[in-house]
Amino acid sequence: MSQDNDTLMRDILGHELAAMRLQKLEQQRRLFEKKQRQKRQELLMVQANPDASPWLWRSCLREERLLGDRGLGNPFLRKKVSEAHLPSGIHSALGTVSCGGDGRGERGLPTPRTEAVFRNLGLQSPFLSWLPDNSDAELEEVSVENGSVSPPPFKQSPRIRRKGWQAHQRPGTRAEGESDSQDMGDAHKSPNMGPNPGMDGDCVYENLAFQKEEDLEKKREASESTGTNSSAAHNEELSKALKGEGGTDSDHMRHEASLAIRSPCPGLEEDMEAYVLRPALPGTMMQCYLTRDKHGVDKGLFPLYYLYLETSDSLQRFLLAGRKRRRSKTSNYLISLDPTHLSRDGDNFVGKVRSNVFSTKFTIFDNGVNPDREHLTRNTARIRQELGAVCYEPNVLGYLGPRKMTVILPGTNSQNQRINVQPLNEQESLLSRYQRGDKQGLLLLHNKTPSWDKENGVYTLNFHGRVTRASVKNFQIVDPKHQEHLVLQFGRVGPDTFTMDFCFPFSPLQAFSICLSSFN
């Protein structure tokens, strides 16, 4: 009997526990439904419209997406040209205009120009952390830093001599692009009036948009004409300041001239090899930035470097690419116009940088052949030219402080053209002539000595806001006779992003090669 009673008591307790669990679950479900009802009754809560048809809305979105990605409807897929060379008014294709039967047009959100250009070209916008330049002079510290990677630039088929370039918009100018797209959006907005009884609603909308677009083009032409006149006068003042003809504000104008005047860009059909070998125009400053790509298995030891030119229209245009050779006894960098085919056998190979065994002296060559191997090549091969040399020396403190740099360049003639130096043996090279003391026809430049900051205990250089991070790779090249006149400066602005500014007598290839030597 006792066993039967115990079994009965266990069954009763089990049923009671199950009933309690069911009651708790029911209570939780009621509380959850109550909270959901309270949320639906709030004023700011978005509620679904049962009368709307989701199928029609999804079909419209699908049609707009197909029209936007189709080659015939997208102007950027017709030719691989930069957005800056498209005719005016074609940027209106970046925003979608849908007109209904009642003649009212609704303009969708315009796609940013940078994203549109890179999406259609199959690219990724390179990461760049730009900081605003302050009016006060900024002092940068010298220390060692390492970081992440920047993606490579646009893709281009190898074995084709490059002429012109592709362009993408700088991240700092996004506000300008948004304002331009907003202006174009205002041009396509129809006024609050119905269509004429004798005309279709779509025709009325297009006519009004065309008239407003013409007015906008006239205003832009007038502003551009006034802007070119003012910029020409400003450039004239800056060029006078570079020559030392200024008055009381000549020092300020000289600094502004060293950073503000930019070299004109080549056209789409201009030979890029001749452009990168030609020295910059006197009185102009070419502002560039350099990115380093460490992605991949072997790029940690042999990274890729890409050089972009910053133009006056706030665009970055690809100039050169360089990489370190894998199977080489000394440090050897190959430089090409093609970012995807950096080989000596490629058609876009333009030069190389070679060092000695200790990586203290570097020589810059063009794409000619070695005179010792001339008999192994075809008879039409041209003997290589020496475009410059760089010597690194330790300072008084040994290797603890910044290095001393001496840049040796061939001289220029009266037409500001570089004198050809084609040595047939080692004794005729630029480094041998410099070591012998034969400096006739040579231009010697040195790096600016950093000042010691006692408070922070570091060496500092004034980069005027163009360099924002401390690094031992930061340097400035000056003329020994004019210490305040910068001809080349290089410094870090991101983990793998650097700025490079240079002027006459440097060419883009020479400046890029000197900066590559500092990475070794």
Curated annotation (Swiss-Prot):
Keyword Transit peptide appears in the UniProt entry: no
Region (Disordered): 141-236
Any single Gene Ontology cellular-component annotation: cilium
Molecular function via GO: protein-containing complex binding
Highest taxon of the lineage: Eukaryota
Basic and acidic residues bias spans: 211-223
Known tissue expression: Strongly expressed in testis. Also expressed in retina. Expressed in cancer cell lines.
Entry's localization field: Cytoplasm; Secreted
Gene Ontology annotations of biological process type: protein localization to cilium; visual perception
Main location: cytoplasm
Alphabetically ordered keywords of this record: Cytoplasm, Phosphoprotein, Secreted
Phosphoserine PTM positions: 135, 190
Biased composition (Polar residues): 224-233
UniProt family annotation: Belongs to the TUB family.
Identification of the protein by name: Tubby-related protein 2
Gene name, Swiss-Prot/TrEMBL: TULP2
